[in-house]
Amino acid sequence: PGVVNFVPGNPRMIVDPCLENPDFAGVHFTGSTRVFQGLWGKIAESLPRLRSYPRIVGETGGKDFIVAHHDCDRRGLLIALLRGSFEYQGQKCSAASRAYIPESVWEGIKGEFVEEIQKITMGDPRDFTNFVTAVIDQKAFDKISGYIRAAEEDPLCDVVVGGGCDDSKGWFI
């Protein structure tokens, strides 16, 4: 009923009722590329019933990056790196999967960054003192641990902290 509505949930339960409304004016979707492609198709099929062409925006299959300037707020950068990389185990579309940081800035925060990572608690998601828990499934575990192994084997990369992966009791990275 409003001008802008945030509607999280099962896409199958949301999309059809929205597209049945002739006033449907647009969607900003965040999720998988495959689901977004299906959504495009459904919208195209609905065009004859709609009063106007809806605006369609999709953020699919990507993750964010962090760019730091040489005179950035270093504490703010440190927090952005930590939260962007580790909240929700890095499994969200806004997760920071890479960072572009001047060497002079990196050398100034590297030690504190490592210290802060070592303070992060990991374990059972039912224990709310844990900041990080297991990744979603075996496929995600295999993919992420593969990236870590590739970094460890690449002579141009330095893994400065962590790198361990354990799937004996959940998919922990």
Q: Where in this protein do the model-derived segments appear?
A:
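PLP-dependent aminotransferase-like
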Residues: P1-V15, L47
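ALDH superfamily catalytic-core signature
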Residues: E20-P22, G26, S32-I173
